[in-house]
């Protein structure tokens, strides 16, 4: 059996609601030897960070595979985590029972998506203008900038009060945490820090 894990933690911030979910059709009739596991994070989609609530959904064309998936998880998940937290379960049930509340939640998610997209659009435009090389940005809370010495570049950025996250092979910028007014000029400062470190 081949297991495919789809991490959809940030799907609510990845684009137009229906468009970003179209790929689910591709996993509905796969061969019986493929089990797709969809990992969903309620803490992201419902902006409930710290609540540690989500779902692991198994999808297979084989009833036998799904029965095994269900049986295994019924015991191992319960033994590992006991039960998920009650306030998050209650929130989910309350929101989905009330069409007006659900519409308000979906509007709020879309507003956050548009806010982050505006930040990304500005950053990528300025990165292009100043020659800062970035990985392509499609959607999400973060963008990445390749670098061979991310620790040194991030340390240099502290001089400009920019606190990025050094990764193994680059720098992560948290678009979700930086207001639009502070995005302007950031790409040029990162490029200058890279140039200073790699001169």
Regions inferred by a protein language model and the residue ranges of each:
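Structural preference for beta-strand elements that scaffold enzyme active sites
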Residues: 3-5, 37, 142, 170
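Active-site-proximal loop/turn and secondary-structure-junction residues that shape catalytic pockets
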Residues: 10-12, 43, 170
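PLP-dependent enzyme catalytic core of the Aspartate aminotransferase-like
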Residues: 86, 151-199
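Conserved PLP-binding catalytic core of the aspartate aminotransferase-like
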Residues: 104-157, 177
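Conserved core segment of the aminotransferase class I/II
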Residues: 28-107
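Short beta-strand
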Residues: 39, 133-138, 164-167
């Amino acid at each position: 059996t081949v297991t495919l894990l789809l991490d959809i933690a940030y799907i609510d911030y990845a684009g137009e609601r229906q468009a970003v979910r179209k790929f689910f059709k591709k996993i509905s009739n796969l061969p019986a030897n493929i089990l797709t596991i969809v990992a969903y994070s309620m803490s992201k989609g419902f902006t409930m960070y710290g609540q540690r609530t989500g779902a692991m959904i198994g999808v297979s064309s084989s009833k036998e595979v799904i029965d095994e998936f269900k049986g295994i998880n019924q015991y191992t998940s319960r033994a590992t985590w006991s039960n998920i937290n009650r306030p998050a379960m209650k929130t989910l049930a309350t929101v989905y029972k009330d069409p007006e509340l659900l519409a308000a939640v979906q509007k709020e998610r879309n507003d956050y998506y548009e806010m982050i997209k505006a930040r990304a659009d500005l950053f990528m435009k300025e990165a292009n203008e100043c020659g800062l090389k970035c990985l392509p940005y499609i959607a999400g809370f973060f963008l990445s900038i390749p670098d061979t010495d991310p620790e040194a570049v991030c340390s240099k950025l502290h001089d400009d009060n920019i606190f990025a996250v050094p990764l193994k092979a680059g720098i992560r910028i948290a678009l979700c945490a930086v207001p639009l007014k502070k995005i302007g000029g950031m790409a040029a400062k990162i490029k200058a820090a890279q140039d200073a470190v790699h001169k």
